[in-house]
Regions:
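Ribonuclease/tRNase effector modules and their secretory precursors
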Residues: 1-125
Length: 125
C-alpha cells in the first residue's frame, strides 16, 4: 500500500482572514509594521507575512490597543474541505507588544483537532 502524501499546508487563507478580521481593530497610523509568524505542524514550515504601514510604532502607542482586548471570529472554509477555522484574538501576557492569535483547525472527517498559534507582533523601532 502506497503511503499517502501529506498535503503541504497553505497559509494564504489564514493570513487573509487575519488581515480582514484582526487588523481593522488597530489604528494603522500608529503601526510601523505587523509581523505574523506561525509554524505548520506537518512540516514545521514558517509562515511569515509583513504588512507595511510606513509609520513608526512608539512604545506609548501600544496603549492604543485596548486592555483585555478579546475578539472571537469564526471562518468557515469551502464546504468541500469540511474544515472550520476559529480565530481567537487576545491582547495578553506581560509583553503588551503582541497579540496572540490561536487558531483551532478541526476536520469533520477525523476525530482529531489541533491548535495552531500565531503571533501578531508590533515591532518597536
Amino acid at each position: 500500500m502506497a503511503k499517502k502524501k501529506r498535503k503541504k499546508y497553505d497559509p494564504t487563507h489564514l493570513i487573509a482572514a487575519i488581515e480582514k478580521w484582526a487588523l481593522p481593530f488597530y489604528d494603522k497610523k500608529h503601526c510601523y509594521y505587523i509581523y505574523v509568524e506561525g509554524r505548520a505542524r506537518s512540516n514545521q514550515t514558517r509562515i511569515e507575512h509583513i504588512v507595511e504601514h510606513g509609520h513608526d510604532l512608539k512604545v506609548r502607542d501600544l496603549d492604543l490597543i485596548p486592555e483585555g482586548i478579546n475578539h472571537y471570529f469564526e471562518y468557515k472554509k469551502d464546504s468541500t474541505y469540511k474544515n472550520t477555522y476559529n480565530y481567537y484574538i487576545n491582547r495578553g501576557g506581560k509583553d503588551k507588544g503582541f497579540i496572540k492569535v490561536s487558531i483551532r483547525i478541526s476536520d469533520k472527517d477525523s476525530k482529531r483537532a489541533w491548535i495552531k498559534t500565531i503571533f501578531i507582533t508590533y515591532k518597536i523601532k
